[in-house]
Every structure is written in C-alpha cells, then in structure tokens.
C-alpha cells in the first residue's frame, strides 16, 4: 500500500451519492489506460515482493507480548528524515491497516533472477525497522516510558491474542468508545491513524447494515468451552451491541471487526509481463496455484486467543471486509427492526438494482481473463454477477473496445460500491488520473490481482510499469530466509510459465479452484487433504483433474511443480542439467538449493508449517489447560520463540526443530553478503 494522501473522507451516507459517478468515471479512466498502454510490448520481467510486519512489544517483566500501537511515527520518519537511509539500502516502507503494522518492499524492482539479493533486501528492511525501534526504546527509557519493554518487527501472519485483554501497549484502551468499528474486542487504536482507515472501517459496517462477522471453528480439546466465552454484554452502540449473541455460533471463535482480518500480515509478489496478452495468460495460469500456496504457507492457527480448527487467514480477512448487505448475501438481517428488508446502508433509489452476490469483495479469483489459445469460456463455470452497464461500455466505445472475457472481469469488479471516497478527489481528469478506477479495483481483494498500468505507460515509456500480475495468497513466514524462498519459488514458476507459454496449458474449471480454496483452510491440509490439480500441463490437454496431496502436487513427475515448472526453467538458465537437486553442489547457486529444499521438505511433510509449529508449541506448553486458549504466558513464550527464530538463534534447538538440522546448520553458517546482488 503506497503512501496516503491527506483529504476529507466522506461518510457513507454522503459518499454513496457519488457511487455511480465514481464507477462511470473509473471505467472511462480504464478505457484511456487501454488506449494508451494496450499496445505496450517487450517489457522485461521486473518483479518485487511486499512483506508485512507486526511491531510487537515484549514486556519481559510482566511476561506479556503486545501489539505496539505507540510507535507508529516510525512510518513517517522512515519516509521523511530517514528517507536517505532507506534509499541507500534500496528499501521502502509503507502504511498498512494496523497502527502496529509496517509494509516494506524493495525501493526498485528486481530484474529476472537476482539470487540471494531478495533475502538480503528483506534483511535490510528488518534491520532498519529494528534500528528505529531501538532508537525509540532509548528515548522512552530517558523519558521513563515503556520501561522494561522492547519492540521488535516480526513477520507474523496473525497475532494470537488479538482482541484479548492487554493485547496492545496502551493503558485502559476502553475508557472511551470505539466509534469506527464498534467492536466488542478491538479498540480503534489498532487502526492506522490516517483518516482513510477508520473511515473505511465505518463505511463497510454502515453499508452492510451490521458489523462484520467472522466465525472460525475452534480447535476441540478436552476442556474447550462449548461457546466463545469472551462475548459480553455492552450498551454503548445500538443496535451493534445486540448483534454478538445472534451472530456468534457454538463451537466457533466470534470476531466482529475489520481489524481481525486486515490486521493480518502476508507476503505478496508482483510480476510485470511482456504485454497485456502475456499478463492475461500468466494470471490465468496462476489461478489454481493460489489455493495450493495458501495451504502450503499456512501460518495462522490461532485467532482472538483461541486455537482454531483451521490453519490460514484468508476467510477471516474475507469476512472482515464483507460489506454485502443481508439482501446481497441472501440471508435475513440479524435485527430486522434496525435493518429493514436487509438493504443495510444502500440508498432507497437503487435498492431495486441490488444483486445477490455469492462472495465477499475479498475472495479467491472469480473469472479467468481468457485471450489465450488454451482458453474456453466454459471454464468460467461459477456464479459470477456482473455490472451490465459497465460490460456494455467496455465492449462498445470509441476509445479501446475490450473483448468479452476481459470486459467481463472488470464488469464483475464493478458490481461493488466504492467504500473510501475523498471530497477532493471527486472530480478528476480521466485522461491522466486513475484514482476512480483504482477506488474499485484496489478494494477487490482476490488471490490474484490483474494490474493495468497508468495512462502514462505508453509503449515508449519503459520507465512506467506495464501490465502486471500480483500473487497474493502467501501467508507471511517468520524468517527472511523463508520469505525469500517462497518469493523465489513463485518467481521461478512465473518465469517458467512465461518462457514456455506455448507449451503450458494450466486451465481447469473455476469451480474446482473455489473448492480448493475451501480445502486450503483445513487444519493440516498440507498433510491430510487432497486438492484438484491438473493431470497434465501439456499444450494438447483439456481441463481434466485428479485429487492430489500437496506433496504430490509439488513432486509428481508427470504434473508436479518441481518437475514441470522449477527444473525446466533452471535447466533453461543453465543452473542444472537434469534436476534441481544438482544445485547443492553449485558454488554459485547453493543457497537456491536450500530455498528449494525448504519448500520440498515442507510440501512433503518432513518439516512443519508455521501453523503446525505454533499449534504444537501451544499444546505442549506447561501452562496450557487443554481448553484451546492461549494465555498471556503462552503467547509471550511463543512470540519470544518467534523472535529467536527470526534471528537464527538456535540456543534452545528451536531453529533445528523448525527448519530441520541440515537447513538450520546451513542458514546459521551462511548468511548472504549484504553487498551481493547476484
């Protein structure tokens, strides 16, 4: 997420009057983009990753670890007085939803294969954040603030005690009301101070007509309560405070705020394709990799102080920004007295146009983009409503008519309302601005994002980014080594897809992808579940699939990721002759071998996922009471372990347990040179 402009945010009941204006103007901006950049070609494979961190405050005296919401000035300083430090180290920091969060990227994109530099750059980002936080600790000590505590940036997918007592480092956060979210569990201090974020939170709640609602299955142990006993009665907000007992379900962890989802962290990787056609092909080819990589990277086994009976974050974020009204969800409102006919905050004059929408605006991919010789329209076999007005405009116009399949993609995105509108940005020059288009585009959060360039990205302007695809499902991992390994893996897959594009047909039915996303949430899916995976990726095959385990999906000689995508591109680059394991004996690419070994060993179940490691830690902790609850002491010890792992500290044998003896020994002895860019 880039730096945020200041402005005057419009509250939902005012902003909704401009919804159609923003949609209309956004589509005109998109047409100007296609007119300007549609013929762009021969762009190089630039790419880059985005890592999200949680700043965790460790109170060693009280044995409590909390989210740090007191030092969010770090973002301003890193982009102002410390900008030269970031520039010199080729890193860039950006805001995220949580006040305790940092997003960091390379300042300039990578070009093709860059070896260990991905990891080096990640190390630099973490080192700079740690340096700033240590500065604050010294200042706080002088001012007698936060005495005895230390704040560190951890790449955690989820904070295990989010929404529990004493989970943020401010005293008495409940001595005032939390008007933006109205959550029973999250004070508004968890939200980024920038006006966009509390306004977005309130707009989603108001449009929906109810608070958001996420029910995640509890992990069942011998003393697990029948219901979520953290729910309590409150009379601050009517009707919201009446919803919890109606919305929660026995045997489930109940969450009621955007922060539970958008406060999670992830790893995202974006790739520039040579042209729009290759970008569409790449997007479609990666669609079914998304649920596989979600399950493979599982790192979220706990929410709101409970162990969950699932391992990933995705459905929690999906629910956290689900602004669909009861009418759009096809359900009755929780409190009909306050949500007449289930239309929520939708204006009366457009209620007759309301569609039933099967999924949240944060979901898996809904449509293949097509345009490839391998594509058949029947592959899009799911219920995907579209904005017919938008579809018509994209198909028939005098600027840049789109083909049906690409037009349908954008027409589907445009069934959504804008949920973040600034007064100063209502009127724009559609020939030069893409803000209205991005207002809708960037608030459709799917497992992949097809990213058009701007109107300035004409074929001769190679300094402007071209047609890109963002891969979004990865859960963030604890170690820079792990995150670099996962980033390099998806780079190799992308490079393989683009290099051998005439020979790789990755299409399956979209309904199978949706089923895979559900399976990916299951506890230990990497070990015990099977997923729909294509029997063959040859160019003469159809969409036939069979059910395979994650290990088979990675290793099967006929259709596995290693033999069909990774090894061929390594051979093409001259890194190996027959098999990726040859890298172990390469003086130049040994680290790549250990990246791929980590991935292979995780996929085969020889090494635990982060989710499995976390769950086992809790279950084996001496303070655990077999009630599925994560106490302060358990959380403190768990996150202290995460801190040690992050810094490759194997003094307690944790790194060896987590990575296996061979990889742990390698990473301890072989830290990449921060000067190396090969």
Curated annotation (Swiss-Prot):
Disulphide connectivity of cysteines: none
Class in the EC hierarchy, top level: ligase
Catalytic activities: L-cysteine + L-glutamate + ATP = gamma-L-glutamyl-L-cysteine + ADP + phosphate + H(+)
Means of activity regulation: Feedback inhibition by glutathione.
InterPro entries: GCS, Gln_synth/guanido_kin_cat_dom
Protein's UniProt keywords contain ATP-binding: yes
GO CC term, one of those recorded: cytoplasm
UniProt GO molecular function: ATP binding; glutamate-cysteine ligase activity
Gene3D superfamilies hit by this protein: 1.10.8.960, 3.30.590.50, Glutamate cysteine ligase subdomain (1.10.150.710)
Pfam family name, one: GCS
EC number: 6.3.2.2
Note: Present with 5130 molecules/cell in log phase SD medium.
Role played: Catalyzes the ATP-dependent condensation of cysteine and glutamate to form the dipeptide gamma-glutamylcysteine (gamma-GC), the first and rate-limiting step in the production of glutathione (GSH).
Protein's UniProt name: Glutamate--cysteine ligase
Species of provenance: Saccharomyces cerevisiae (strain ATCC 204508 / S288c)
């Amino acid at each position: 997420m880039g730096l945020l402009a200041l402005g005057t945010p419009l509250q939902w009941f005012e902003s909704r009057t401009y919804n159609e204006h923003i949609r209309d103007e956004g589509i005109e901006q998109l047409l100007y983009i296609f007119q300007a950049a549609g013929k762009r070609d021969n762009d190089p494979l630039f790419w880059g990753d985005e890592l999200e961190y949680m700043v965790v405050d460790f109170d060693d005296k009280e044995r409590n670890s909390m989210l740090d919401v007191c030092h969010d000035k770090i973002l301003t300083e890193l982009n102002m007085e410390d900008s030269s430090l970031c520039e010199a180290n080729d890193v860039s920091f950006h805001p995220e939803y949580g006040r305790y969060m940092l997003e960091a990227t390379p300042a300039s994109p990578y070009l093709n294969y860059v070896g260990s530099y991905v990891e080096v750059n990640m190390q630099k980002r973490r080192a700079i954040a740690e340096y700033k936080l240590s500065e604050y600790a010294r200042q706080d000590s002088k001012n007698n603030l936060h005495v005895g505590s230390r704040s560190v940036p951890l790449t955690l997918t989820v904070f295990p005690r989010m929404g529990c007592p004493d989970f943020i480092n401010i005293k008495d956060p409940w001595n005032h009301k939390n008007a933006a979210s109205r959550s029973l569990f999250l004070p508004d201090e968890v939200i980024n101070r920038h006006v966009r974020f509390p306004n977005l939170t309130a707009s989603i709640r108001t449009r929906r007509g109810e608070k958001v609602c996420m029910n995640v299955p509890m992990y069942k142990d011998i003393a697990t309560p029948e219901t979520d006993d953290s729910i309590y009665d409150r009379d601050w907000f009517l009707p919201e405070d009446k919803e919890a007992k109606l919305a929660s379900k026995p045997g489930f962890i109940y969450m009621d705020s955007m922060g539970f989802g958008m406060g999670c962290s992830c790893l995202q990787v974006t790739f520039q394709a040579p042209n729009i056609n290759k970008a569409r092909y790449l997007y479609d080819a990666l669609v079914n990799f998304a649920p596989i990589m979600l399950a493979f990277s599982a790192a979220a086994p706990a929410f709101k102080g409970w162990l969950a009976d699932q391992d990933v974050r995705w459905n929690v974020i999906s629910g956290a920004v689900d602004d669909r009204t009861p009418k759009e969800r096809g359900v009755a409102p929780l409190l009909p007295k306050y949500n007449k006919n289930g239309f929520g905050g939708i204006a009366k004059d457009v209620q007759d146009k309301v569609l039933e929408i099967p999924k949240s605006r944060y979901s898996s991919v809904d449509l293949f983009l097509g345009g490839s010789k391998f594509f058949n329209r029947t592959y899009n076999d799911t219920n995907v409503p579209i904005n017919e007005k938008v579809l018509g405009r994209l198909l028939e116009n005098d600027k840049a008519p789109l083909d049906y399949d690409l037009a349908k993609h954008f027409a589907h995105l445009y069934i959504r309302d804008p949920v973040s509108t600034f007064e100063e940005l209502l009127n724009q020059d559609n020939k030069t601005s893409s803000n209205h288009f991005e207002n809708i585009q960037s608030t459709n959060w799917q497992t992949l994002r097809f990213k058009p360039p701007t109107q300035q990205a004409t074929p001769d302007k190679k300094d402007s980014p071209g047609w890109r695809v963002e891969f979004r499902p990865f859960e963030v991992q604890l170690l820079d080594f792990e995150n670099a390994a996962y980033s390099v893996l998806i780079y190799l897959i992308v490079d393989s897809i683009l290099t051998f594009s005439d020979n790789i047909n990755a299409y399956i039915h979209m309904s199978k992808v949706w089923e895979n996303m559900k399976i990916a949430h299951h506890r230990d899916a990497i070990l015990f579940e099977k997923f729909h995976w294509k029997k063959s990726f040859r160019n003469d095959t159809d969409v036939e699939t069979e059910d395979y385990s994650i290990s088979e999906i990675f290793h099967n000689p006929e259709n596995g990721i290693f033999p069909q995508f990774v090894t061929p591109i390594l051979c093409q680059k001259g890194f190996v002759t027959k098999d990726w394991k040859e890298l172990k004996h390469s003086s130049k690419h040994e680290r790549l071998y250990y990246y791929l070994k980590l991935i292979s060993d995780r996929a085969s179940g020889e090494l635990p996922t982060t989710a499995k490691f976390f769950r086992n830690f809790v279950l084996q902790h001496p303070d655990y009471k077999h009630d599925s609850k994560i106490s302060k002491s358990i959380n403190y010890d768990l996150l202290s372990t995460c801190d040690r792992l992050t810094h490759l500290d194997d003094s307690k044998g944790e790194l060896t347990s987590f990575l296996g003896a061979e990889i742990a020994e390698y990473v301890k002895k072989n830290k990449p040179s921060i000067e190396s860019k090969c």
